[in-house]
């Protein structure tokens, strides 16, 4: 959400841009009331797209979702259906998927007023050849790309989208099983519909071009742009006072390594957990003063890892898990961290790595996906499967001040942080040229 929010805030400052939303019930784009834009961007208003089932002409994929949800309520039946499709899932993996989806539905939402779509729109947009629709979010959730394709043929407008990554195509093992086919269909449709795509890294852009070539899809015009690394809350940016952030009590007076990410298989928390507990068990880190901090909600297929961390006395004492924190609290965690960690198996960008470097911190990272593009020569790279290597590097960064400060000085001397203002300027300028 951060990318969409930051770009939208800056788009609101331009007289050449307006805000719209796709109404799936009426299969058209509608203009958002200018009076509602600021409250929406500030999180004061949450727009509800819910409609009675008889009013919603759902795209074909929704019927697949309904059928899957019905079968998923019966794990052994779901397991049998997947085996027929040539895919094998254990009952534990199926339970993880059910838990992940239940947590996603019940996750705390920002404190805001929920209003129906009809209350924030002021009519259909008059589409023509001079119109460009820019989609900054995930089209598969609330849009019908096939219907948008038909609209394009009638009205001649252009359609641009942000591409974050192609994980479902490249590493489907790291995607919630029920979403794999849906997202593969989504990308196939998106690249036919979109006239231009802005990718969040050159790595993602290369992946997109390879995908289009592989499947014989005419590649849309494309470019890449970097993401901003300044953590600025909506309240702070608007000048509104916000409560001062404080470190969690369990981190007061501690030194800690920080990993900001949803806990899920692709992010590779297990390697850090094993590397960390190994160092603790061997007495190379001090349980009285050293902490490993995970910031992010628990995702899918990590039930065993969470259970293991909860049961492990070393992890109970020295690994801190945080979620649903504010931007101000995240900013404070970055400022006080000794080092940043990013062992992911694949990233479309790796925003937390950029944010950590923006705070001048020493970082350990894998080279996967776009991470080397973000980190350059300012980061120490370790294979994501090298548990021993991660353990030794973490110990060295805590215990060898010379090694850690050497990285910090290199970051301070040569790193050029990208602000969200600069990222937005590049995004809109490069998109204009496509």
Short names for language-model regions:
Residues 1-434:
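Carbohydrate transferase catalytic cores enriched for Leloir-type hexosyltransferases
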């Amino acid at each position: 959400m951060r990318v969409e929010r930051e770009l939208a805030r800056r788009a609101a400052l331009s007289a050449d841009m307006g805000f719209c939303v796709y109404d799936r019930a009426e299969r058209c784009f509608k203009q958002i009331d200018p009076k509602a834009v600021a409250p929406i961007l500030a999180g004061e208003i949450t727009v509800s797209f819910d409609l009675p089932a008889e009013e919603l002409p759902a795209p074909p994929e929704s019927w697949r979702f309904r059928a899957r949800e019905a079968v998923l309520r019966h794990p052994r039946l779901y397991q049998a259906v997947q085996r027929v499709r040539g895919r094998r899932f254990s009952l534990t993996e199926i339970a993880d998927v059910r838990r992940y989806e239940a947590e996603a539905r019940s996750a705390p939402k920002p404190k805001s007023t929920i209003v129906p779509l009809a209350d924030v729109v002021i009519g259909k947009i008059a589409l023509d050849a001079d119109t460009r629709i820019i989609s900054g979010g995930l089209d598969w959730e609330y849009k019908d790309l096939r219907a948008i394709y038909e609209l394009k043929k009638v009205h001649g407008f252009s359609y641009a989208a942000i591409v974050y990554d192609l994980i479902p195509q490249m590493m489907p093992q790291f995607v919630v099983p029920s979403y794999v086919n849906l997202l593969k269909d989504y990308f196939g449709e998106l690249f036919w519909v979109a006239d231009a795509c802005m990718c969040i890294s050159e790595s993602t852009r290369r992946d997109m071009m390879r995908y289009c070539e592989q499947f014989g899809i005419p590649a849309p015009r494309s470019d890449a742009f970097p993401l901003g690394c300044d953590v600025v809350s909506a309240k702070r940016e608007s000048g509104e006072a916000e409560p001062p952030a404080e470190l969690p009590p369990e981190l007061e007076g501690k030194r800690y390594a920080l990993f900001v990410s949803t806990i899920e298989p692709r992010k590779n928390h297990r390697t850090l957990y094993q590397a960390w507990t190994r160092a603790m068990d061997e007495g190379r880190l001090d349980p009285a003063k050293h902490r490993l901090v995970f910031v992010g909600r628990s995702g899918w297929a990590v039930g065993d890892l969470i259970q293991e961390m909860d049961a492990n006395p070393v992890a109970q004492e020295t690994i801190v898990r945080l979620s649903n924190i504010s931007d101000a609290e995240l900013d404070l965690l970055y400022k006080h961290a000794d080092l940043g960690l990013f062992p992911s198996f694949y990233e479309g960008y790796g925003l937390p790595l950029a944010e950590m470097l923006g705070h001048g911190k020493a970082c350990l990272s894998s080279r996967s996906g776009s991470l080397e593009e973000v980190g350059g020569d300012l980061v120490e790279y370790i294979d994501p499967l090298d548990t021993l290597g991660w353990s030794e590097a973490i110990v060295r960064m805590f215990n060898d001040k010379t090694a850690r400060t050497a990285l910090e000085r290199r970051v301070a001397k040569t790193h050029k942080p990208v602000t969200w203002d600069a990222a937005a300027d590049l995004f809109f300028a490069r998109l204009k040229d496509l």
